Amino acid sequence: MVHLTDAEKATVSGLWGKVNADNVGAEALGRLLVVYPWTQRYFSKFGDLSSASAIMGNPQVKAHGKKVINAFNDGLKHLDNLKGTFAHLSELHCDKLHVDPENFRLLGNMIVIVLGHHLGKEFTPCAQAAFQKVVAGVASALAHKYH
């Protein structure tokens, strides 16, 4: 559960509606793979991940980024039940994919960075704080199965 004020909820909802979510997802996942190269081990089937330009242009990275951001978007619709919303994905990433749960936090930070880049001056410190709460809640929900 994420505790947002009414103003924070309005900020998150309003700003989220201004971005192309698919682009945010693709760029955030790409940045994760570039900035934290050890995360690439989970994506060995994605082909060429040899350089930043290869990663950012990789169609499989873009497609998976879209999938990731669609799940994030679902979370935005269920902020009061993130654990329930992400229960299946938490189980999948824990039991089958064996993803280090710290990566969820790192990806959340990449989403915030990309939002800041795309929204510019509209992404105020208060907006960033609201989105940080959301991505922290999503990361916690995704890591729930690990506890």
Swiss-Prot record:
Asymmetric dimethylarginine sites (modified residues): 105
Effect of residue 126 to S: In strain: Sprague-Dawley
InterPro entries named among the record's database cross-references: Globin, Globin-like_sf, Globin/Proto, Hemoglobin_b, Hemoglobin_oxygen_transport
Biological process (GO), any one: hydrogen peroxide catabolic process
Keywords: Acetylation, Heme, Iron, Metal-binding, Methylation, Oxygen transport, Phosphoprotein, Transport
Residues carrying Phosphoserine: 13, 51, 53, 126
GO MF, one example: hemoglobin alpha binding
N6-succinyllysine: residues bearing it: 18
Tissues showing expression: Red blood cells.
Family classification: Belongs to the globin family.
Protein name from the UniProt record: Hemoglobin subunit beta-2
